[in-house]
Amino acid sequence: AAAQQKETAAAAGGGATVSGYDVGGLYLSGPNAGYRSELPPAQFMEWGKPTVGGHALSWHPLAGKNGNPTPGFRATPYPPRPIAFVPFPGNPHDNNHTPGVLPLSWVNMCEFMCNRLSQCLGDEYSRFDVSTSSRSPAFDLAFTTRVLSVTGMESEPGNNKWYNVDCNPGTGTMIAEFDCPADAWFLEGSSRGDLMPYSILMEIALQTCGVLTTWNKAPLTLARTCDRDNILFRNLDATAKLLRNVDLRGKTIRNESTATGYSMLGEMGVQKFKTKLTIDGGEPFYEVDSSFGWFIPEVFEKQIGLDNGKTTPAWHLIPKNAGPQPVVYALPTEEARIFSKVAGAHSLQRRSAQCGYLDKVSFIANSGMHGKGYAHGHKTVDVKDWFFSCHFWCDAVMPGSLGVESMHQAMELFSVNQGLADGIANPSFEHDRGVTKWKYRGQLTPKNKVLECEVHIKKVERAAGGVTVVADGFLLVDSLRVYSTTDLRIRIVPGAASAAAV
């Protein structure tokens, strides 16, 4: 039977389809460990239970190998995806899997992402095991490989004087790591192989904050104060500074995040952090000051966005802003029209659909809030969008970072459409160093219908052999503005400049 199952998996190319979803990345534990599963839907939906052949499903290819435990699944309305990342071999911090004991390994993080929180952080968190509380992002967005240490926490065991917990959630520094493969999906899909999309930088920086706030018992403050187990964690604001462009292929990225404050406002907890990213023991290359909130779900039943609940059409459709009608390009089918007049355009194009977040884009020159150009992006929301399985496993919501990435995509396409790459040999995009800010006051879930983004160009500067483009932006969900961004930054540089990444 085992041999037959191996042959079936091989013949199927490791793929399986359940209700229209590709779930070919599941792996078998037990005697068939390492072979991708080919299971009929009725068996597949028994997540975590033995199949007819007596093998349990796991979402991680290291499960059950070399004495490794098998992380569990919890069934949700969304199917799991193929595992995108595995730890680099030989790291001594990956051998201990004891819940609540540092370091936290990839096994603990798998449990945090898709199963029982207590199997990552210990029995005190068991009240969240069967809840829909926010988890650490999973699958393609699982950017915390391991947690090495937590220091500097203020605590008094047994004395619940900090909002009903015995440690101060606003203290402590966590060191975590992400092992970034050289062929990561986001590197393979970006316009060049050494360019990590800005959204992924954001996620790598912010995800450790989610682990630290949970380790610091912030969700327990809300759970115990409000007697609620289903609570949601959301980024509210951030100021980020890119200090230098770094080639992160095949690198272990170290995240140092420090909690700088925590307060409760009724049925909401607000947490602040300072984060820096480094590699190879070097100086930081990306720094973020951020704030997050813990909420009860009812807060989002009627979100009010940035404008106190008032909906609005996109900027170019507001009568007072009437002007030339933009030409609309369907993506990706008409993307070639945008790039057709650019020499070396292939080096500017995103290389995979997964790295694109828009299905339409349009531009107006010399327009927008700053009079220097305007881009509008559109996406019809699909309940099968890949990121809903990843973020979060028990609480499906589009990552704010991908909303920001949709603005970056619109900026890139605007820049090409307006000829800003003309005269640059083998042009390519890179991130412009400097400060970018964002604010989130709402969310996009599978229940929503339409995402729109606006990009308002505020600076176009030719210098140092390249072109710098800076813009402000907004994201609308069903005509409600929910995100704002300040100073989105990209550069167009000659192809040879890609060697400057160190």
Report residues per predicted region.
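Non-catalytic linker/capping segments at the edges of enzyme domains
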Residues: 2-196, 243-249, 260-272, 276-280, ...
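Beta-strand/loop-rich accessory regions of lumenal/periplasmic or secreted enzymes
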Residues: 193-224, 401-404, 408-410, 414-419
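Well-ordered mid-protein domain cores that form the structural environment of catalytic cofactors
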Residues: 215-218, 225, 238-243, 441
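Substrate-binding beta-hairpin/strand module that engages nucleic acids
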Residues: 222-232, 420-433
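Short, structured beta-strand/loop micro-motifs enriched in basic residues and often containing a Trp
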Residues: 234-239, 432-438
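Short tryptophan-centered beta-strand motifs in secreted/extracellular beta-sheet-rich domains
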Residues: 253-259, 451-457
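Hydrophobic, ordered structural segments
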Residues: 283-284
